[in-house]
């Protein structure tokens, strides 16, 4: 009987050991958070263009080659939508991407994600939420937040405060500003800064941070593909801090 008990304890020991020790985070080249604006200014058709653009990007051969081309040969990616200061929804959880199959499954998850529209635009809320997402099972040599939107922040705390806290954590903030080509009313146009200028001065930051400007939602797919390829590059190529896609 004693021998049987000892044998049982020996067999159980590895499981107990595994349960008692925290698993190390899995190494990846980049931890990338995709933060997608779903405020009221993004109408249903434009929102569909956003989701379709991200989906197409993760099916693109060049992007997949970039994912597999780093020292580790993998990235970790998560996607969430945002609007008001307190409204953020994870639509695709953290996923390791290391092959065409995993990238395509990520694209499938984007295609299946729910589409919702909310009221306000809180870029600071999006940054704060994104900053809390890192370190959840992965350890990247770079931590990057990809913020896409079509308007300035009008909800929550100052964007500058959220940005500075994120930068202090070693997070790089890149932007994808989608320009509304409809002329603003004269009064509003005089008090609201151009969106590309706003993102450049108030939103992006960190080593190698850059901004891609989509000239309308019709340019979103090409813009987001170009942006993510640049973000996941093993050694991000030097380039203009602002890049325009028409």
PLM region spans:
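N-terminal export signals
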Residues: 5-23
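Von Willebrand factor
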Residues: 26-91, 104-143, 145-148, 175-187, 194, ...
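Second-shell loop/turn segments in exported
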Residues: 35-45, 110-120, 149-153, 189, ...
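Short beta-strand-loop
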Residues: 73-109, 186-200
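Exposed acidic/Ser/Thr-rich ligand/metal-binding surfaces
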Residues: 120-169, 246
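VWA/integrin I-like adhesion module and closely mimicked acidic/polar interface patches used
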Residues: 152-198
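C-terminal "exit" segments of structured domains
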Residues: 212-246
């Amino acid at each position: 009987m004693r021998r049987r008990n000892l044998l049982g304890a020996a067999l159980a020991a590895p499981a107990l050991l595994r349960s008692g020790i925290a698993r190390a985070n899995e190494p990846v080249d980049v931890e990338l958070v995709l933060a997608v604006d779903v405020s009221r200014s993004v109408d249903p058709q434009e929102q569909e263009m956003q989701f379709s653009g991200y989906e197409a990007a993760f099916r693109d051969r060049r992007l997949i080659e970039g994912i597999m081309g780093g020292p580790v040969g993998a990235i970790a990616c998560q996607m969430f939508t945002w609007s008001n200061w307190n409204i953020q929804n994870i639509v695709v959880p953290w996923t390791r991407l290391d092959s065409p199959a995993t990238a395509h499954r990520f694209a499938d998850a984007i295609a299946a994600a729910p589409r919702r529209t909310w009221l306000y635009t809180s870029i600071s809320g999006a940054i704060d939420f994104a900053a809390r997402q890192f370190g959840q099972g992965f350890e990247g040599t770079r931590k990057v937040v990809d913020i896409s939107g079509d308007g300035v922040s009008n909800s929550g705390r100052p964007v500058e405060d959220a940005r500075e806290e994120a930068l202090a954590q070693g997070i790089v903030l890149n932007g994808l500003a989608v320009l509304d080509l409809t002329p603003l009313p004269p009064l509003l146009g005089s008090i609201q800064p151009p969106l590309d200028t706003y993102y450049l001065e108030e939103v992006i930051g960190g080593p190698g941070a850059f901004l891609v400007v989509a000239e309308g939602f019709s340019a979103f797919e090409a813009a987001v593909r170009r942006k993510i390829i640049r973000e996941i590059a093993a050694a991000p190529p030097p380039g203009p801090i602002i890049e325009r896609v028409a």
